[in-house]
Amino acid sequence: MQDAITAVINSADVQGKYLDGAAMDKLKSYFASGELRVRAASVISANAATIVKEAVAKSLLYSDVTRPGGNMYTTRRYAACIRDLDYYLRYATYAMLAGDASILDERVLNGLKETYNSLGVPISSTVQAIQAIKEVTASLVGADAGKEMGVYLDYICSGLS
């Protein structure tokens, strides 16, 4: 896992250069948004269960996946879905704090799509639920922080699609 600082420094180091104006601007932007990201992460952490519950109610609860024969029909499958959505929210929060999506590739997306396809988990329903997480989160943390968090939730959706 990297953070925005490490990514900028590593890029300059590989090239054997000092940080240029563009690199400094990236660092300034990262530091300027730090308080916003920390506040958002605090709100998300305190409300994670509610965020996931509301997102499921908004996107999956009365869909085909929750009906008998659907992919979330048994209690065990439903619990696994909730667990996965909580996992995505947690890792997207880590990525937002770091200002870098690399943790999502390493810990979430690497092999996930293939695993879901082999298990018959409907990717479109998962993406729909993640989009609902994005909406619920934005309503709790505000527009600016919601936009920042949305970058990482969208990243997960893109990786699954």
UniProtKB/Swiss-Prot annotation:
Gene3D superfamilies: Phycocyanins. The keyword Thylakoid applies. InterPro entries: Allophycocyanin_b, Globin-like_sf, Phycobilisome_asu/bsu, Phycobilisome_asu/bsu_sf. Contains one covalently linked phycocyanobilin chromophore. It is a peripheral membrane protein. It holds the Pfam family Phycobilisome. Signal peptide: none annotated. It is found in: Cellular thylakoid membrane. The keyword Membrane applies. NCBIfam families: apcB. Heterodimer of an alpha and a beta chain. This is Allophycocyanin beta chain. It comes from Synechocystis sp. (strain ATCC 27184 / PCC 6803 / Kazusa).
